[in-house]
Amino acid sequence: RKADGQDAAGDAFAWRVLKRMIFLGVFILCQVVPMYAIYTFGPEIMTAFGLGEGHEAILGESAVSLFFLVGSIPAMFWLNSMGRRKLLLISLVFMGAGLTILGMWPMAPIFVVILAFGMYAFFSGGPGILQWLYPNELFPTEVRASAVGIAIGFSRIGTIVSTYGTPLFLAAFGVGPTMLVAAVLVGICLIMSWFIAPETKGKSLAETSALEESIPFTRRV
């Protein structure tokens, strides 16, 4: 009976670790693919939105890159004042809204395109930080290194998908559908985060990495 109890406890531990691993992997993949697509193919995407060729497209992409940088600064403070979960959900809503505008209105005026890209880039700061913070907070010591490794692995997968998939999809379907696919990925991340993303604000590392069901996965915003 003792052995059976130990086996059951081991199975429960493995399932809770797996559940967090799935959350981490999907979260990182859905966050990284659109971001790296915009990072890597910014000038081409800007040209497709009518920002012109060469220097004009590069200037537009540089403005978006500035939003990426600026957005990460307040996010570092909001992580503790607002909380991880709330910051993640709010950020994903605005990121998805920006991409949806771009996807539904590919012929929008230039200022709308820049503002929509800026909205996405600015609010990506929070998820970008959580991409590396969550693996260290959500897993006990014995599996934490593996969790960080998995996070890095999914990040690399997202980079590969963006690098090889974005130009092919742009050429085949155009910039509007490409942005809508990116918005769908952000939407998937939002839905999953609503049901699964934990709040670790104000908790010690021992508390956040504990695998009891009562601690990590709350649906309260």
What are these regions (language model features)?
Residues 170-184:
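A membrane-interface helix-boundary motif in multi-pass transporters
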Residues 94-107:
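C-terminal ends and interior cores of transmembrane alpha-helices
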